[in-house]
């Protein structure tokens, strides 16, 4: 999800993992970044288990989302995405499309900007979006009308803009909106989702790795060590803060790098799995109670020449993590979650360079940077490609993450939005 050099559960959900699904979301919806639970997993069933040689049917293709690396969200019977449009005074626009035929339902100006990376978060009748310069807006999800707005730059002074811009998708948790300005006294903030008022803000100590401020991902929720906490990979390390008041709990620097820490961490029970590229690697941490706080202990660390996820995400299905491994590579790889043992991979795969992945109905949907889609069986027994095809539109690096919702595979490609029918007939 970045720019030129890089522009950047199906499985078990244990009783220890706290899930925050946006209000009004139906099981078929994908209302936010990485899906209902921010884990890249769709609950869809009845999907194709093998693709035809030319791929699943293209249901529709439309122009109009605008430029950018934003993925899509589905909710309220609508497909939402965000882009820079040459419309009116230009700038960043949110556009709503019909999932049935791609008809544009409405579009609304969000803010001035030259690019956009983050996906929208839809919560009932509200939509939230962060721009690359730290613009934060809340819009009416039925019309696009503005509700409230903030600016990381002016409301949280000292927020250092990441090299390719802010790229998070804010998290809705109950009545709160959780964001990552990365400022010295507001590394992570909780806002009233209805008004934008600050509930708490917390200083996050620099962990000694990477760079100051935000990374390129959002927040996930963990109940590790019996404490509800917000976990994210910031520019300088992996961190956890207490959800109730923002109290800093723990940090870990080895998975941060000096350029861009991007993948969304995976949480399950008392464990957190994280990875980043640029030769960095991957790690599993165990969270344990320590007095009134929480301590994070490294279970294992895998060097970058074994496993590293540049960007494109990772999914945990059963006891295994599936990802595209390698810097500027998306080589399909399977790793045992609790041990770090590589079950299989890295495999060459049908496409080249980085890959964005999600999972549905026992299969991995790999979108490679060169515009090739691959369907791979999600099994630790071995690599099994079940079909691949070239996307109908390839306008540059194919970095926006795929979305599987209501039997449809959505692909954003700059000013194109593609919808494939992946239902089994």
Indicate where each model-derived feature is located.
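Bacterial N-terminal signal peptides that target proteins for export
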Residues: 1-11
């Amino acid at each position: 999800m970045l720019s030129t050099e890089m522009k950047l559960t199906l499985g078990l959900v244990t009783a220890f993992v706290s899930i925050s699904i946006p209000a009004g979301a139906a099981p078929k919806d994908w209302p936010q970044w990485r899906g209902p639970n921010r884990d890249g997993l769709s609950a869809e069933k009845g999907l194709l288990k093998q693709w035809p040689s030319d791929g699943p049917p293209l249901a529709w293709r439309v122009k109009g989302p605008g430029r950018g690396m934003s993925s899509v969200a589905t909710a309220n019977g609508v497909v939402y995405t965000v882009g820079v449009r040459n419309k009116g005074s230009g700038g960043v626009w949110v556009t709503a499309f019909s999932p049935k035929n791609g008809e544009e339902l409405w579009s609304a100006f969000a803010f001035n900007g030259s690019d956009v990376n983050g996906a929208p978060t839809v919560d009932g009748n509200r939509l939230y979006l962060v721009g690359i310069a730290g613009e934060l807006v809340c819009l009416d999800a039925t019309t696009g009308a503005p509700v409230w707005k903030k600016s990381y730059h002016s409301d949280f002074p000292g927020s250092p803009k990441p090299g390719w811009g802010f790229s998070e998708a804010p998290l809705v948790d109950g009545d709160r909106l959780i964001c990552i300005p990365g400022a010295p006294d507001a590394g992570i903030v909780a806002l009233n989702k209805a008004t934008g008022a600050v509930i708490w803000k917390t200083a996050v100590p620099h962990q000694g790795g990477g760079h100051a401020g935000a990374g390129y991902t959002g927040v996930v929720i963990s109940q590790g060590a019996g404490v509800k906490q917000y976990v994210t990979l910031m520019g300088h390390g992996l961190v956890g803060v207490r959800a109730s008041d923002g109290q800093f709990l723990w940090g870990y620097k080895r998975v941060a790098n000096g350029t861009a820490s991007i993948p969304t961490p995976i949480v399950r029970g008392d464990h957190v799995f994280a990875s980043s590229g640029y030769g960095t690697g991957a790690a599993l941490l165990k969270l344990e109670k320590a007095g009134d706080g929480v301590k994070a202990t490294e279970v294992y660390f895998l060097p970058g020449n074994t496993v590293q996820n540049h960007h494109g995400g990772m999914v945990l299905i059963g006891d295994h993590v599936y990802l595209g491994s390698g810097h500027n590579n998306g080589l399909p790889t399977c790793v045992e979650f609790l041990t770090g043992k590589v079950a299989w991979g890295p495999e060459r795969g049908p496409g080249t360079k980085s890959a964005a992945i999600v999972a549905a109905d026992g299969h991995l949907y790999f979108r490679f940077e060169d515009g090739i889609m691959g369907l791979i069986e999600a099994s630790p027994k071995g690599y099994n490609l079940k079909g691949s095809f070239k996307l109908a539109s390839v306008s540059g690096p194919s970095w926006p993450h795929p979305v599987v919702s209501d039997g449809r595979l959505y692909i954003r490609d700059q000013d194109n939005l593609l919808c494939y029918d992946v239902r089994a007939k």
